[in-house]
């Protein structure tokens, strides 16, 4: 078995939990791929046990891509191209499904009408004013990302490509590939954002070790629009996500 370690980064998890931990609105959070590699290569070996004699192989970066006809696809492709040029990163893309829903709109409008009644003001006028200042955006959900993580982790573990896997994710569905990698003789460390509250219980129980990304490293990984930096110094394209 190779004396190497790999990172498996679920970008959806890092974006959601990282933006919350850093106090950045989710829609404004930009992920810095080069900072993630820095953490894996420089910080992690001093943070967790068992890295003596191990070399960093690469980080697999899992995200969802919009459909080619989507208005935001061109800009997203530009970002992905930059990430793909980041040294030490291999980009792996699932799909980003988008759907319009009134799942939140109805209960919010009902709450506003109740509040209007308590305040003695017109409910219709309040709701109409709110809708003039608020845009109901479609919900987005990653598809196929967990499958890609599963396939890569199992394939690489069974081929002996790595000794240790560092999984930055929290989904319960990833418990099975973790178990399979361990059965192949590999060690699996699960890295969390915000502690085990963001981690599925089964994943936490299976992990050989659970660690939390330090706040200073996290702040470099997840930046706001005014604090962003190039995701890596060798590529001409920006890689913030």
Where are these regions (language model features)?
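Nuclease catalytic cores that cleave nucleic-acid phosphodiester bonds
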Residues: 92-241
């Amino acid at each position: 078995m190779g004396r190497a370690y790999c990172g498996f980064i679920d970008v959806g998890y890092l974006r959601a939990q990282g933006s919350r931990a850093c106090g950045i609105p989710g829609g404004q959070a930009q992920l810095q791929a080069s900072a993630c590699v820095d953490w894996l290569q420089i910080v992690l070996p001093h943070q967790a046990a068992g890295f003596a004699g191990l070399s960093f192989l690469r980080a697999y970066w899992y995200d969802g891509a919009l459909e080619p006809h989507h208005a935001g696809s061109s800009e997203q492709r530009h970002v992905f191209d930059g990430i793909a040029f980041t040294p030490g990163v291999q980009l792996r893309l699932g799909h980003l499904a988008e759907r319009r829903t009134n799942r939140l709109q109805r209960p919010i409008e009902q709450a506003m009408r109740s509040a209007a009644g308590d305040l003695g003001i017109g409910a219709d006028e309040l709701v109409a004013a709110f809708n003039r200042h608020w845009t109901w955006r479609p919900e987005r959900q990653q598809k196929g990302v967990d499958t890609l993580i599963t396939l890569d982790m199992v394939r690489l573990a069974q081929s002996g490509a790595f000794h240790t896997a560092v999984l930055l994710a929290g989904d319960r569905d990833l418990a099975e590939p973790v178990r399979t990698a361990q059965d192949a003789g590999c060690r699996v460390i699960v890295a969390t954002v915000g502690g085990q509250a963001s981690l599925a219980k089964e994943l936490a129980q299976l992990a050989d070790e659970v660690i939390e990304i330090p706040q200073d490293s996290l702040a470099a990984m997840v930046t706001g629009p005014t604090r962003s930096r190039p995701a890596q110094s060798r590529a001409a394209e920006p890689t913030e996500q």
